[in-house]
Amino acid sequence: MSTAIYYSTHNNMHTNDDITNGSGSTTSGNPGANPSNPNHTNAGATINNNSNIGLNSANKNHTTLLPSLAHIMPSNSNNTTNSGSSIDISSTLINPYSSGAAAAAAAVGGGNGGYYHPPPPHSQQQQQQQFDTSYSNQTTPTSAYTNFNNDSTHSPTDISMQQNMNNLASSSGNMSIGGGIDGNFSHNNNNNNNNNNNNNNKCICKSKVNKIPRPRNAFILFRQKYHQMVLDEGTVIRTNPEVSRELGRRWRGLSPQEKEHWNNLAEEEKKNHAKKYPGYRYTPRRNGRNKNCPVCKNKPLPNNKSNSISGMSGSGGGGGSISGASSLSGGLTSRDNSITNANAIDYQQQQLQQQQQQQQQQAIQFQSLPPDQYQQLIKQQQQQLQLQAQLNGGGGGGGITSNPQTIPQYITNGNYPSYIISPNPYSTTSTTAPTTTTTTTTNASSIGLSVPPTATTTSTSSQPTSANSQLHFYEAEKLSPVSSTHHQSSISEIAAQQQQQQQQQQFMYNTNYSTIPPNNTTTMQQHSAGTGNDYSLNGNNSGNTGYDNRYGYGQPMIITGQSQQGLQVQQQGQHYNSGLHAAQHYQQQQQQHHQQQPPQ
């Protein structure tokens, strides 16, 4: 659609213009024509409506009188309503749904006899597009501002500015009306909510209309009699608590005859109250709370009312208490005494089941750990058990020894064959002989040779570890029958053999018949990690019989990349499995050695 609009920049009124509406869109004007001729055809508009769709009529010419508001409104005198005009004030500048649409249409639409015809809704978008196109054409350089056929005295810039202001005014008016309604509505809602909250938060305990007052006693009657008198004295007493304090001091200073007078008045008051309210019974509020009052029902209970559960506060007497029971009893309190003892016992059982499940999970995790970490975790568990025993153990031996349920299941579930729980469960203990766990000890301080710490081992059955001795996991009679019978005899025999070995070692190393070079001993001491071959010092690998092969009964195995603790376990298992047989073999070797020595 091609639309061209021509405005005049002068103040002259031009009429009697010839306009040809067709495909050519040509106009001609006579500036010097008679201005008194009021008849003109489509003044100030040249329109080609052949391409418009959805309009009522095309190429329609209206002949109307010039309205009196021509100098006020920036529009043409002929308002071509629904005719595809590029400047349609009634359809584009005025919102048909606003409150002032009818008045504006009556003022503008002079060509239609003062009637306003709102456009259909489906044509508003097309008309808005036409208005945008006409506005862009007004601002383009192709628009020639010449003296052609325009009755308006305003420039195109003024017209566009005023049109934009009208649009903003109409839209802002609607927005202000809606905003005011919404704002008032929200304000009213807020006020209603605040009023409801205030009503809900009011205490209704003292505002009961039908509540029967209590009969007054002697002091209340005395205070009501002299309350105003104390205020009238003009002293520093001003408040009700001060008045009550002063009257209480005076009440205590009354004579018995005067108190008898007030007591008689109180008795009479009570009789009259009983006659007036025959079924009255004083019912105080329980625990200082009123269930019907929205404020008082949420008040906390006094400290003396919050009783703990009596069934959970066991002291461990008689040795039957569980370690976690006393710890649970401290945190379980009943605010309104709704939890019963049965519920508390159920809760305790649930807690115990959870603890057992956690212990089973820990046992599975511990079994997959290496020996070093396993030993550390065992020590930590034992320390925790000892602390719990000290905290929870009461009278009658309520410690760990009397509470078998506190022992973790990974200790007592029978994963290990013996009653003795060694620090390292991966150590191999042989059960071929009754005294296999009992080994000999050599006093390295009395000998000139430095022996590694793994060589000095103790009897695990007679000298248990500190953790085992504290937990008392075993007793002497609980061991195997053979070991329990030979327990004392084996210890005495080993002590005698140790003394004999020490005497022989002192004699041997003090003489010059030792075949061990001293340099090898120092190099062995300086070695940081050890070689695993510490006990075969004199050609034991080559098959020669040296004097120190008493430590290695059998060929030792060298394992590299092993920890010191692993070496200790291995050496204990390899070098001391024979028990007393190793000591007997050593005695035979010593006898052969003394026979081969030359006389001194």
From Swiss-Prot:
Under Pfam families, the record lists: HMG_box
Q: Which GO terms describe its molecular function?
A: DNA-binding transcription activator activity; DNA-binding transcription activator activity, RNA polymerase II-specific; DNA-binding transcription factor activity; double-stranded DNA binding; RNA polymerase II cis-regulatory region sequence-specific DNA binding
Q: Which CDD domains match?
A: HMG-box_ROX1-like
User: GO biological process annotations for this chain's record?
Assistant: cell differentiation; cellular response to starvation; filamentous growth; filamentous growth of a population of unicellular organisms; filamentous growth of a population of unicellular organisms in response to biotic stimulus; filamentous growth of a population of unicellular organisms in response to starvation; negative regulation of DNA-templated transcription; negative regulation of filamentous growth of a population of unicellular organisms
Kindly indicate whether the keyword NAD belongs to this entry.
no
Q: Does the keyword GTP-binding apply?
A: no
Q: What induces it?
A: Expression is regulated by WOR1.
Q: Which residues cross the membrane?
A: none
State the DNA-binding region(s): 212-281
Q: Phenotype upon knockout?
A: Leads to constitutive hyphal growth and avirulence in a mouse model.
Q: Which superkingdom is the protein from? A: Eukaryota
Basic residues bias: start-end ranges = 272-289
Renumbered residue ranges of the record's region Disordered: 1-59, 112-160, 180-200, 266-337, 427-549, 564-600
Q: Which PROSITE patterns match?
A: HMG_BOX_2 (PS50118)
Location within or outside the cell: Nucleus
Bias regions of kind Low complexity — which residues? 20-39, 47-59, 188-200, 297-312, 427-470, 497-506, 564-574, 581-600
- Its GO CC terms? nucleus
Instruction: Indicate the principal place this protein occupies in or around the cell.
Output: nucleus
Function in brief: Transcription regulator that functions in both the positive and negative regulation of filamentous growth, depending upon the environmental conditions. Recruits the TUP1/SSN6 general repression complex to achieve repression. Regulates genes encoding cell wall components that are specifically expressed in the filamentous forms such as HWP1, RBT1, HYR1, ECE1, ALS1, RBT4 and RBT5.
Protein name, UniProt field: Repressor of filamentous growth 1
- Source species of the chain: Candida albicans (strain SC5314 / ATCC MYA-2876)
